[in-house]
Amino acid sequence: MSDVVSKDRKALFDSAVSFLKDESIKDAPLLKKIEFLKSKGLTEKEIEIAMKEPKKDGIVGDEVSKKIGSTENRASQDMYLYEAMPPTLPHRDWKDYFVMATATAGLLYGAYEVTRRYVIPNILPEAKSKLEGDKKEIDDQFSKIDTVLNAIEAEQAEFRKKESETLKELSDTIAELKQALVQTTRSREKIEDEFRIVKLEVVNMQNTIDKFVSDNDGMQELNNIQKEMESLKSLMNNRMESGNAQDNRLFSISPNGIPGIDTIPSASEILAKMGMQEESDKEKENGSDANKDDNAVPAWKKAREQTIDSNASIPEWQKNTAANEISVPDWQNGQVEDSIP
């Protein structure tokens, strides 16, 4: 045993033997004991010798040797197991190797990049030309960024200006619209007021016209009567002026009992009898005042008055009297001639 175990490992070996001889771990699984001894740094050969020390019989030694061989081959089984064996390790295929290779490559690439970027520049500084080139490239990038930012700022300023102009135009339009609505409302109210005033004036004018027409119906009839009387009087005056004294005497002594022309009353007498003399005088005064201002009389009224004047009717009995010669008997003519000196 002294040949197998060296002097520097003698203490470790003796502790392993004393561990195996302990009664508290006597019933422990053999594999657990072997794993524990391996964890302490003993070799397989030293473990085998240590296992033989507590038990000098050959059965235990053969059993220990078999267990050690099963650990190396990972295929043999223990003949004296006190509990179930742990499951065997799964068999590795190409996927496991691929994953391991990928992970290894990633780690190696990461280490390479770290070394290239940080370790090597600190150990071996780069040349000034390369540093200047990198600096220039960085400056170019910053210049591009500044240009883009300036363009964006200009676009934003123009957009804000357009928006402000649009808002101003919209505000002006709204103000104009409000003013137009106010003016429209005022105009509508003014038109409504004027319409009411015109309506009232039209109603008043209509009432005035109706009243005037109703008042002038009797006046028109009176004017017609007055004109007929004036025409009768003028005709009689004409007859009287054109006749001679002989005719006047003949008419006055007519044996037929027909009254003479002198017995016919004048228009003033007739009106006095009818109680209308004052009204006729007023109408004459009104007619004289109207003649002073002919321009104030409408054309239709002038035409109507002319028609009435031109068509002044003369009674038929007057026309017949004027047209027919008054027949005087011969004996009356003789008497008249004898009476004339």
UniProtKB/Swiss-Prot annotation:
Record's GO cellular component terms: peroxisomal importomer complex; peroxisomal membrane; transmembrane transporter complex
Spans traversing the lipid bilayer: none
Swiss-Prot/TrEMBL GO biological process terms: protein import into peroxisome matrix, docking
Disordered: annotated segments: 276-341
PTM sites of type Phosphoserine: S313
Entry keyword annotation includes Membrane: yes
Ranges of biased composition (kind: Basic and acidic residues): 279-295
Motif (SH3-binding): 86-94
Similarity annotation: Belongs to the peroxin-14 family.
Function: Component of the PEX13-PEX14 docking complex, a translocon channel that specifically mediates the import of peroxisomal cargo proteins bound to PEX5 or PEX21 receptors. The PEX13-PEX14 docking complex forms a large import pore which can be opened to a diameter of about 9 nm. Mechanistically, PEX5 (or PEX21) receptor along with cargo proteins associates with the PEX14 subunit of the PEX13-PEX14 docking complex in the cytosol, leading to the insertion of the receptor into the organelle membrane with the concomitant translocation of the cargo into the peroxisome matrix.
Subunit organization: Interacts with PEX13 (via SH3 domain); forming the PEX13-PEX14 docking complex. Interacts with PEX5 (via WxxxF/Y motifs). Interacts with PEX7. Interacts with PEX9.
Protein name stated in the entry: Peroxisomal membrane protein PEX14
Native species: Saccharomyces cerevisiae (strain ATCC 204508 / S288c) (Baker's yeast)
